[in-house]
From Swiss-Prot:
Name of the encoding gene: engB
NCBIfam families listed in its UniProt record: GTPase_YsxC (TIGR03598)
Species lineage: Bacteria, Bacillati, Mycoplasmatota, Mycoplasmoidales, Mycoplasmoidaceae
Keyword hit for rRNA processing: no
GO cellular component assignments: cytosol
Residue ranges of every copy of the EngB-type G domain listed in the record: 18-186
Binding positions for Mg(2+) per the UniProt entry: 33, 54
Family: Belongs to the TRAFAC class TrmE-Era-EngA-EngB-Septin-like GTPase superfamily. EngB GTPase family.
Residues that bind GTP: 26-33, 52-56, 69-72, 135-138, 166-168
Entry protein name: Probable GTP-binding protein EngB
Pfam families hit by this protein: MMR_HSR1
Function of the protein: Necessary for normal cell division and for the maintenance of normal septation.
Length: 186
């Protein structure tokens, strides 16, 4: 059963083994923790309606892989020193972690920001295995995604196969996300 392992402030705290890892990265309040709970089918990640609650790299065990929930990027309501700390945690993990096999960028489907686009470009240039998870599909009509999928893919400069639309709230397409993660871990 999936479970929380630990929170890490720096690379000194990371688990030292060779188990494959994926990470979730996204703006504050896009539902990364809720998505982890939906994947686990249990409440293993703390959730909050307040943006910026995840301020460490949180490690979760999912049997064949670990999932790391990184702090949200772009959250403005923190001090400059805290912003620097959060950026350092993200950068250290993204650039130094040898276990990392894929990055899943979580984006709120109703609000794709310039910062999301910039991060997508940066991650695409760094990783072959960079996927987009459009969360909060429950907030949009199904026809919105069907009618706008090609535009969204073009805007994000991603192939359609590298994008999945989900709802952590009502678990729409969670099986498809699990299948994608499984294909990456093999």
């Amino acid at each position: 059963m999936p479970s929380f392992i630990k929170s890490c402030f720096s690379s000194n705290d990371w688990i030292t083994d060779d188990k494959k890892e994926i990470c979730f990265i996204g703006r504050s309040n896009v539902g990364k923790s809720s998505l982890i709970n939906a994947l686990a089918n249990a409440k293993i990640a703390k959730t909050s309606n307040t943006p910026g609650r995840t301020q460490l790299a949180n490690f979760y065990d999912f049997d064949k892989f670990r999932l790391i929930d990184l702090p949200g990027y772009g959250y403005a309501k923190v001090s400059k020193s805290k912003h620097f700390e959060l950026s350092k945690i993200i950068s250290e993990y993204i650039y130094l972690r040898k276990n990392l096999v894929a990055v899943f960028q979580i984006i709120d489907i109703s609000v794709i920001t310039d910062l999301d686009l910039q991060m997508s470009e940066l991650l695409s240039n760094r990783f072959n295995q960079h996927y987009i998870v459009l969360n909060k599909a429950d907030k949009e009509a199904k026809s919105y995604f069907d009618n706008n999928f090609a535009k969204i893919a073009a805007k994000l400069k991603k192939d359609k196969e590298n994008i999945v639309c989900v709802s952590a709230k009502n678990k729409t397409n969670i099986p498809n996300l699990k299948k994608l993660i499984g294909s990456v871990i093999l």
